Amino acid sequence: MPRIYTLVNQKGGVGKTTTAINLGAYLAYYGQRVLLVDLDPQANATSSLGVDKYRIRGGTYEVLLGASPAAPLILHNPRLKLSLLPSSPALAGAEVELVNELARETRLRRALEAVAPRYDYILIDCPPSLGLLTINGLVAAADGVIIPVQCEYLALEGLGLLTQTLDKVRQALFPELGVRGVVLTMFDGRTNLANDVVAEVQKHFPEKVFRTVIPRSVRLAEAPSYGVPVSAYAPQSRGAKAYAALARELLSGDGVSVPEVAAPSPSAKEE
């Protein structure tokens, strides 16, 4: 069975989708069979992989509503060796439509059970909120959550609330829910604040912070507009190298050997 991680943070703009896409791309690059699940009605992960969110034949909305199993809606990118269960703006209505349904919090987990044997890793990209969609993502996180945290002061404010939500999900729905790790993003070592944030996050989640820190990177910000992860857009950039290192760190921590693979092709887009 695959390792299933949910990327979650109710604060927007912390690099959650960026981390989901680029971590997934590098896990695939290192030989893992990866499924990325877009659970956000904004469908940014879908768009960032070059998929038109308005023209998909179905995605997480249809899966959660029981209109379709997941398998026929999964898209595979042969170039990236990465699979995607896409999202669309229609997903915004799912929380209202599911409000009176039984077992509504476990819909995603049950839907993924049928396709799970096909993959080594499933990464679930949640919306920046703590509603029913995110609860579905948390309950499906068989191997824990990955929490991206921007290295800025305001990013710290929501950590306490997120911790409370995780505790509530453990108590009511999924006692085994754990934190796989915290990823520090948009790090600028030139500022004292960034280093202060690192120290504060380590207080909240002792021994859970990934060693790899994701720097601020123009190339990371540009890549989605080209519909590709940074590994395909600017593989020699600092951001690309950081996500490659994060993927290796995750694999190592999961007891998966990292194969020797050729370096990504050089790109003119470097930092």
Feature-to-residue mapping (PLM):
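P-loop NTP-binding core
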Residues: 1-271
